[in-house]
Regions:
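Bacterial N-terminal signal peptides
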Residues: 10-17
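Mature extracellular/passenger domains of Gram-negative fimbrial/pilin and adhesin proteins
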Residues: 2-7, 20-182
Length: 182
């Protein structure tokens, strides 16, 4: 190999090594998450009795929940906001991340052992059937009325959601919620 060819080869090799080193040095391995929010003194109250809802999902067959992503047993519930401040125009339930299955964003079955159903979680849904990931806010509803009657009835639901082939058993979970405003 001539000295000129060897020089070109060496320069190309060193250049590619420098480029790969530069590329490795620019890889991003850290970042930040910025949180913005707002607190308000303008609020609504949760109607007495709605602060601790119990939803009974129907007893259904595991055949209806045979594979991941299958849903069944949708059951509606409502939460009523009352006594809303005059400047509150929309209200919704924000469902906290309590009991969240990190794989699906749905609510884990808290039961364990032989009596617990397996490969099933409970999915929160808006009134149109669209899923609500735990840690998210459901659909906002318009606030209407005056005085203590100023409020909104918010309609949501829960349904079984298969994470795989389900097995027979009991399901129990819960979602904490907080009123959110627009």
């Amino acid at each position: 190999m001539s000295k000129k060819a060897l020089g070109i080869f060496t320069a190309a090799l060193l250049g590619s090594m420098a480029a790969s080193t530069a590329f490795a040095q620019t890889a991003v391995t850290q970042g930040k998450v910025t949180f913005d929010g707002e607190l308000t003194t303008s609020t609504c109250s949760i109607k007495a009795g709605d602060e601790d809802k119990k939803v009974i999902l129907p007893k259904i067959s595991t055949v209806d929940l045979a594979k991941r992503g299958d849903t069944a047993g949708s059951t509606s519930f409502d939460i009523t906001a009352t006594n809303c401040a005059a400047d509150v125009n929309k209200v919704a339930a924000h469902f906290e991340m309590t009991n969240m299955d990190p794989d699906t964003g749905n609510l884990k079955n808290l039961l364990e052992g032989d009596t617990a159903a397996k490969n099933v979680v409970v999915q929160l849904v808006n009134s149109d059937g669209a899923g609500i990931r735990a840690g998210s806010t459901g659909r906002y509803y318009d606030v209407t009325g005056t005085g203590t009657e100023r409020g909104a009835m918010m309609l949501y639901g829960g349904q079984y959601y298969a994470t795989g082939q389900t097995t027979a058993g009991k399901v129990n979970t819960f979602a904490r919620f907080t009123l959110a405003y627009q």
